[in-house]
C-alpha cells in the first residue's frame, strides 16, 4: 500500500479538478518549507557518530528498515547527523525553530499565487539543502504532470543560492523573485564587492582606485573564480585603508553563476517582483492552516514514507 502512490493520485486528481474550474493561474508560483515534529521521543536517540546495531529486533522497525534502505541507495555525504532517533532515524535533530532541539521533517509546498492552491507537496528531512533541492523536483513534476510552468517563482533568501538561481534562469527560464543569497557586503568601513566594476569583455575587475584585479580562470571547490590585485598597486594606493588594510592585496571571489545572480538582482525593484513578495505570504498561510486549523504540528506516522503520505493527504 505504501508503494502504491494512492495519496499522490488523490492529490493530483483534486488538483486537476481545481485547474478545470479555473482556480490555477499558472503564471507565478511560490515555494517554502516548514518544520513538522516527528513522532519520535527526544530521549530515545543516540549520537550520530556512535555505532548502532540496527539489526536488533527491538530496533529494526519499518521506519528503521526504510532508513537503512535509503542509506544504501544514496551516496554518502560525508557528514554525520548530530543525533539519530532510534524510533524514526530518518527524521532530523534540529533546533532551527528556537528552543530545545527536537526530531523533525520539513513539509515543502509549491503553490500557485492566484488563490494559493497547493500544486505539489514534498517531504524532506529538516535540512535546508534538501528543502532547496526538492524545489527542482516539484517544479519539474508539476510541469511534467500538468504542463504548468511559471513565469516567476517567489521564495525567501534560503532559496537564493547561486546554483538554484542559475537553474531557474538558465535552464527553466523562470524569473527568480528571490533575494539573492549574498555575503559580498564585506566588513563595515571597507569597500564591498559592489564598489568594484566587472569588465566582462576583458574578464577582470576594476577597483575604486582604477587598478585591475586579474584571474587565472581556475574554478575553486566553492564554484567561484578568484580575482586578485597586484601587490605593488595596492601598496601605493591611497584607498588601501578602506579596501584591504590587513592584507597585501584585494581578492574577490566571483561565482560561476554570477550572471544569473546579477539578473536576479536586477529584478528587485520591478513592480512584478514587489507584488510577488506580497503574494508569497499565501504559502505561509497554507502552513498556518496546516498547523493551526488541521492541528498537524506533529506527525502521527513514522519514516519518510509515512511522513510524506500524511503531509500529502493534508495538502489535498
Each language-model region and where it sits:
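Anion-binding and metal-coordination hotspots
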Residues: 1-316
